[in-house]
Amino acid sequence: MEKNTELRNAWDFVEHTGISIFLTGKAGTGKTTFLRAIKQHSTKRMIVVAPTGVAAINANGVTIHSFFQLPLSPFVPESMVKPRFEYSKQKRQIMRTLDLLIIDEISMVRADILDAIDSILRRFREHNKPFGGVQLLMIGDLQQLTPIVKPEEEKLLSRYYNTPYFFDSKALQSTQYVTIELTKVFRQQDEVFINILNHFRNGNVTDTDFEILNKRYQANFNPGKNSDYIHLTTHNRIADNINDRQLEQIKEKAYKFCARTEGQFPENSYPADYELTLKCGAQVMFIHNDRSERYYNGKIGRITYIDKEKIVVTCPNEDEAIEVEPQTWENTRYTLNEQTKQIEGEVLGTFTQYPLRLAWAITIHKSQGLTFEHAIIDAHNKLLHLDKFMLH
């Protein structure tokens, strides 16, 4: 981080000021790494929240709705939030002692949700300051996932907001915050392709871009039986059908691995398949970042050995195979240590499963931010063949 000026600036703002920050940047620029560094090394009392259960689990945080006990209905500015039930004494203490609120995947957070958070924090802290005086670290890419707004919600919210995006929050508009955009991509080295991706991302596609991409179009492209291509599809059903069909064609013994859950872990927040059926020869994708850097979220490989107790995956152009161990994800909630007055994470439950999924196909939505060596995009029933594809 010391060598990256943008990350260093972000760290200084978080650690040495009370100014709120919107940290953005395309996939692969270090947003997740920065979040991990803040959690490990910052001296501030913090909590991490995210708009969805899966995003919260991946960030080792909790959902916005669960922590702030928000109702499912939209929030109308200048009204009072009515929590689903009364805040516990400890929850109130956490909010009163909080220094830093980290919101991951901020692009998915609606403006009214941010205003609801503001209303709650003002109630328990400094009433005249936005968000009760709490510093915000908002992390996300506005050009990836967007807020989910139902038609009836949009009709109501349009009376108060120009857009449903978080930056239209009344509270945020009255807050002085800085925007830091990370620009160096660490997962993609092809400069020509980076430029094309950025043109698509920013809506500035040129004729030259299309000419380069069209050279990759192969109408009758067949990836071959043992290739590591992955189909990017529009719907789960299509991806599941491709994966099931490909797995069935492998004439090897199938092994079923059931996840182990302990304590409280909501089913809609499961980070992996509860039942995982695999065979030797199956193409798989890692769905977790390995701390020892043997694999990363989105890395593709093929199972070269499997039994009831062991899975070995070999990745393209790598001599050393990976013996995969089950990964444990935690469902946490925040508590206040009465003695130290520090905010601590309490593990409510765990989910343990091999960090793998079948990977002949995946939906475009689930592939956000992942890096693939080879991909086939199903676009309007035509196949577009790309190398070194990183979806933005």
Model-inferred region functions:
Residues 1-391:
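Conserved ATP-binding/catalytic motifs of P-loop helicase motor domains
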